[in-house]
């Protein structure tokens, strides 16, 4: 929002760089995979934004996927979508030339609402519609932005496209169209089409909203991962946070969160990670509260509440949203100058007619047939660009009679094809089914219902479509579906290796949570709110819908135990193991952590720096809401069932394994939290200047968080190996629970329950195991995301090291461990192993606790330190247990080499290590048992 563009990005100024017909200027933003620059058209001197994507982070298939998506996006033009104008590829980057939005994004617009009256682009808006006290933006401005957002979403919806990442940071703002006409806005942007800066709805005297970055979430999944870990899931629908299958209604939840933030000034739910966020959403039970002093109208509040329904079935649908009075009706409270005129076109006409959509895909000829290009005197670069734009206000009947060229990844239905003049519908238009994504396949019942609703919506549409011969349409549809399926399969094979493991874990947790045996006699109404019985102590069970059971572990723990909570589980510190089946999860995690994260290990030779462990206030494992009393006193008291004793042992083994994983997770969190400030989240102010910490500091010496590159690499390596260790322990917990569940399904453990003598006991055991499984599932998903974030940080850090550094990629002696491309491989420095880090830290904690006990300092934390050290040492031994339990046929040669490396660590054989560790456990356990608080 600066009027002096020569001052833009003084700290990050780069030499001008020609990119096709454009010149790249200064940097205005930075992300995890791309850098955004301001650019200018070399002849027209109009401004563009150039997004330079680093190809080194994309493997071959992802590059092909991105190219297909780009071809589709080039054919989508709408006034409220940031247009992709051009694309240039070099050996190292893909440069995406996009429309330039001078006012920045909506999030900064809201944050700096108190200073908008001082800026030349927005001072007239604030003079007419001042921001209210107790609120964020004036309701006139809120409704104006909402209308434009709905217009863009309807355009996407008619083409069966889902954005999946609607948030204020992806809603960019341009100066009002009237400011361009009056000359107030001096920076003229390059037009993607004739009506790029002519609003389809809303007011011409207010800033114009455009959706950005749609369609890239799937092609560039590293962004969603980095953003997820840095705080952007604040706007994600709960079904996505629960790792459930979802449809386009996820966008409506995001619209509700954005609308709430425009009204209140902050998101409706705030948390530091997606696990805590989901817990808060579930705890809220659809009760959306507004500050008492907030002046928002009841109509706006009601719309927000209908959009922010946890259950997508109960959420407002697209038809109702597009037809509601807030979207279709006039904006109340307008001043006389902004009163609507009869000549203004309606948003619905623009959305459904597609007059702003380029009628021909750029994959074919750049000049559409059957349509003359109209000259635009205000657009001098048009002839040189050889790009066709639709005529302004062109009615639907003037479309080209030549269908657009087909694209391999084209997502448009038959209704989106060009029509012949003045022809009407001859066949019922049908929207293609929702695209099943690699990260979230489409849920069948929602897909079917969605398709039915789409037909009804099309019948009510004002649009007219040409009839397409049935045989031709069917053949083309079959070809498109087969090509799209091939693309989906190839994409999943190359990228979503981790996701498949998460799917297995989530599938078992879903099965257990929805089983009638687990639910017992509890109500099974699909939409009724039910409360967990038997809460203990002060724990409050959260009322949730059974459909949201996949996230019920949020009720159990938020992932971080409170320092003031009491660890009530009195499990023995002796090692008890159940028979762990060799499931796909355990096998995959043990066989190749590298297969999950692209990791290869150098032979361990020397030990690098260790790290600080969790603080003494860290509680290893959260208490469950179900009663934790003795299982032996529940039932009829007549006799004890042998299978009941086995169930009790199973519960204890699962809990102890989960506890060990939680201790390792806590250790990894210490490393991870030191990397969080390094997340690529450089923000730009409304003027477009990049806020780069450190000014002109050499980025190779210090990172944004003040850590050296060496420190970043060390922390990333240690966090990564610890997260992988935590995953293996979590997978083992799931395996033990899976074996128990298999026995239950075979009837081996339900012989007595049919007679009614152990129903209460079986229900208690089942609920207790279900609680652990749900907790493990959510922790597993969280660790997967954090491990991927750390992996990317490690790759980035290693590339920034000096070329002669041993950890620089050019000096790695171990070959790639994953066949998806060298860009995804990671090699950890010699000597960095989770077992060594854990062993050193356990001894450090126990020694510190012993000293504190002798000196009488911090006695309250001594027992916690002893218990944590014991669990960490037991987790070290867990590696040997897993290694011996896995058959040799299930491992590959790379794992055999790693096992051989582990047989000798620092000159100590495996058997000797076990003796040393077990001796340490015995000593610490004895010390802990003798510890008594004064």
UniProtKB/Swiss-Prot annotation:
It is found in: Cytoplasm; Preautophagosomal structure membrane. Residues 340-368 have a biased composition (Polar residues). Gene3D superfamilies: Phosphorylase Kinase, domain 1 (3.30.200.20), Transferase(Phosphotransferase) domain 1 (1.10.510.10). Pfam families: ATG1-like_MIT1, ATG1-like_MIT2, Pkinase. It catalyses: L-seryl-[protein] + ATP = O-phospho-L-seryl-[protein] + ADP + H(+); L-threonyl-[protein] + ATP = O-phospho-L-threonyl-[protein] + ADP + H(+). Residues 335-432, 462-481, 531-580, 684-703, 800-822, 878-900 are annotated as: Disordered. GO terms for molecular function: ATP binding; protein serine kinase activity; protein serine/threonine kinase activity. Keywords: ATP-binding, Autophagy, Cytoplasm, Kinase, Membrane, Nucleotide-binding, Protein transport, Serine/threonine-protein kinase, Transferase, Transport. Its main location: cytoplasm. The active site is at 165 (proton acceptor). Its EC number is 2.7.11.1. SUPFAM superfamilies: Protein kinase-like (PK-like) (SSF56112). It is a peripheral membrane protein. One of its GO terms (cellular component) is phagophore. Serine/threonine protein kinase involved in the cytoplasm to vacuole transport (Cvt) and found to be essential in autophagy, where it is required for the formation of autophagosomes. Involved in the clearance of protein aggregates which cannot be efficiently cleared by the proteasome. Required for selective autophagic degradation of the nucleus (nucleophagy) as well as for mitophagy which contributes to regulate mitochondrial quantity and quality by eliminating the mitochondria to a basal level to fulfill cellular energy requirements and preventing excess ROS production. Homodimer. Forms a ternary complex with ATG13 and ATG17. Belongs to the protein kinase superfamily. Ser/Thr protein kinase family. APG1/unc-51/ULK1 subfamily. This is Serine/threonine-protein kinase atg1. It comes from Aspergillus oryzae (strain ATCC 42149 / RIB 40) (Yellow koji mold). The gene is atg1.
